[in-house]
From Swiss-Prot:
Ni(2+) 2 binds at residues 224, 253, 279. It is an enzyme of class 3 (hydrolase). It comes from the Bacteria. The gene is ureC. This is Urease subunit alpha. Substrate binds at residue 226. The lineage of its organism: Bacteria, Bacillati, Actinomycetota, Actinomycetes, Mycobacteriales. Its main location: cytoplasm. PANTHER family: UREASE. GO terms for biological process: urea catabolic process. It comes from Mycobacterium marinum (strain ATCC BAA-535 / M). One of its GO terms (molecular function) is urease activity.
Amino acid sequence: MARLSRERYAQLYGPTTGDRIRLADTDLLVEITEDRCGGPGLAGDEAVFGGGKVLRESMGQGRVTRAEGAPDTVITGAVIIDYWGIIKADIGIRDGRIVAIGKAGNPNIMSGIHPDLVVGPSTEIIGGNGRIVTAGAIDCHVHLICPQVIAEALGSGITTIIGGGTGPAEGSKSTTVTPGGWHLARMLEALDSWPVNIALLGKGNTVNPDALWEQLRGGASGFKLHEDWGSSPAAIDACLTVADAAGVQVALHSDTLNEMGFVEDTLAAIAGRSIHTYHTEGAGGGHAPDIITVAAHPNVLPSSTNPTRPHTVNTLDEHLDMLMVCHHLNPRIPEDLAFAESRIRPSTIAAEDLLHDIGAISMIGSDSQAMGRVGEVVMRTWQTAHVMKQRRGALEGDPSGRYSADNNRARRYVAKYTICPAVAHGLDHEVGSVEVGKLADLVLWEPAFFGVRPHAVVKGGAIAWAAMGDANASIPTPQPVLPRPMFGASPAVAAATSVHFVAAQSIEAGLADQIAVDRRLVPVADVRAVGKADMPLNDAQPRIEVDPDTFTVRIDGEVWEQQPATELPMAQRYFLF
């Protein structure tokens, strides 16, 4: 019996079990561990669309109607990279949700077809063969300073935004907060027409519980405590007390100046309760110099932001000016300058690299336009993984060798911007992974451009953003090929395929009838019992110590030496600027 070579099979149908794929121009490789949609022994039976190919009437396409269960869309032959594994499969989408991950086609003439992947006349096909699919990214730290930030986010593969703001107001430029019911209503209305899921954070800096409850009834999904509004132990305790009663998450940017207490006082105020600590490395803010030690605690869900990812020879130089602008500081005031300089510590930034690699810092966000870049969350995550592989070699459980697969490292790092923030904020019943039942928020990548620019962004089953050529060309591919909004980004479709995540109290208060939005309001799940152990593949709790004089960081007793990277992948090979 004639058999295809692995090379030829990959050319025709995409890679299969045992094949390895390089991610962009990094040193990272992933290996397909399972092929649910074919394989070399089944060549010719794979679901492939095109002239003379399988998915034609009475061949790979059957007669089943949509009413009889045919999926609306099938993504064929995609390599899925998710926290739970790296496999190849066809992905079925129906009513904007993932309904099956397996083998698609016509069971009348094909074997092994998943019952929810029977292709019919009502089924659209997205070619995933030779491409990678990941869950839509979740940016857990977004300042909503301008609406254009949403387009940048979508163009990088982000489909869910957690954060706050009201536009270019001083409060929003410094803090990820949408304060009060009026602002929450206006922002929910403003964001209704964008194809992204939204979870707004209300202002948590108060000791008045009534002011917190009214924000939950007004559409907040949780709270943000920020030092620029005063993150005192009393405010932390009051906010967490209401959060415990409401079941929502609290994000904390703690007191850099240690005016209201030290890191020990903040931990005492938290009192073992679940909390998401922003800027856990400290460069973006938080108790100087030892906020990074909170990553060792079982109740703390730590994240850091992308301007310090990874530590390079340029990281320190760009941070001082960023800090002065973002926190409304005056370089002519010595105290303001000292405040800025106290936060930029190369030793803790370097330690951030290692803590991400061992899974001790669980999440990465952008801090968009407030010391971070919303379009670089995905890219800088994988740059960090690359740098750590170069420095530390294979991760535990991965084989060693130049061309060995890095599946465990890939799964850990993809989790940092997908499932981990979803779990932390109570969104994982809807988003955060490529799993049956969840919203079909999916990103397709050409392997050579993985993490750099998506091939297409599917939002709730509709293509919302894609790499597209000249619209006046005779075919879709002529230059310039740019990330462009697609029909799924039109306001009516965006509202139909996206959700606003809100506290359950706003649903009970009838918020949907009080604001002008067309999308569903979805209550966040109760997160008050969520701890570090619930962060998939990112649950490490090492002992972390910071010398108060030298800022030297010890992790499990070992000093992590600074070796800032001098060259990165996913950079000038892809971008002119």
